[in-house]
From Swiss-Prot:
Cellular component aspect of the GO annotation: cytosol
The UniProt record lists the keyword Hydrolase: yes
Species this chain originates from: Staphylococcus aureus (strain MRSA252)
Role of this protein: Pyrophosphatase that catalyzes the hydrolysis of nucleoside triphosphates to their monophosphate derivatives, with a high preference for the non-canonical purine nucleotides XTP (xanthosine triphosphate), dITP (deoxyinosine triphosphate) and ITP. Seems to function as a house-cleaning enzyme that removes non-canonical purine nucleotides from the nucleotide pool, thus preventing their incorporation into DNA/RNA and avoiding chromosomal lesions.
One GO molecular-function entry: nucleotide binding
The keyword Membrane belongs to this UniProt entry's keyword annotation: no
Annotated protein name in UniProt: dITP/XTP pyrophosphatase
Length: 195
């Protein structure tokens, strides 16, 4: 079985990759390097993904995939953006992040939002490649559903009439921002150099 190393300690992301790549042995970097942590000093999802994949590829001397992803709310000028995981502060819970977002959004009628995922692939003998996927939706007025992680309970997908947290892992795996970025990665790996 082929192996994919994910430069992330976020078990939710690793689980997403496992669902999307069922024919691969998906390994989180913490299984290979204890305490692997890269400071996300970039100002964009792309910069942060590249920082992680290049650092991990150098440390392991093998090809590694990293992603940086988050939620952008149009009425909040793209917040929480690259700060999605720590929107309410360092070491805060998903619940605290959601609460801050809903409070900040208040009764705003423009609830349009998008999840963004940028995947970068780096290796010892290759130029880093970057793939971006998005999924559009709206911020719900409260939390709905029990599945997923992060902002999934408040991210409503109109075409499915569900939040991401109301979808099964398999359903989410077919439409997510990560899935859309991975589609581009897979096309590249299959030889489509125009991706």
């Amino acid at each position: 079985m082929k192996e994919i190393v994910i430069a992330s300690n976020n078990q939710g992301k690793i689980n997403d990759f496992k669902v999307i790549f069922p024919d691969y042995h998906v390994i989180g970097i913490s299984e290979l390097i204890l305490d692997f942590d890269v400071e996300e000093t970039g100002s964009t999802f792309e910069e942060n993904a590249i920082l992680k994949s290049e650092a991990a590829a150098k440390a392991l001397n093998k090809t590694v995939i990293a992603d940086d992803s988050g939620l952008e709310v149009f009425a909040l000028n793209g917040e929480p953006g690259i700060y999605s995981a720590r929107y309410a502060g360092e070491n805060k819970s998903d619940e605290a992040n959601i609460e801050k977002l809903l409070n900040k959004l208040g009764n705003t009628t423009d609830r349009r939002a998008q999840f963004v995922c940028v995947i970068s692939m780096s290796g010892p003998d290759m130029e880093t490649k970057v793939f971006k996927g998005t999924v559009s939706g709206e911020i719900a007025d409260g939390k709905y559903g029990e599945n997923g992680f992060g902002y999934d309970p408040i991210f409503y997908v109109p075409k499915l009439d569900r939040t991401m947290a109301q979808l099964s892992k398999e359903q989410k795996g077919q439409i997510s921002h990560r899935r859309n970025a991975i589609n581009l990665l897979e096309a590249y790996l299959a030889g489509d150099q125009n991706v």
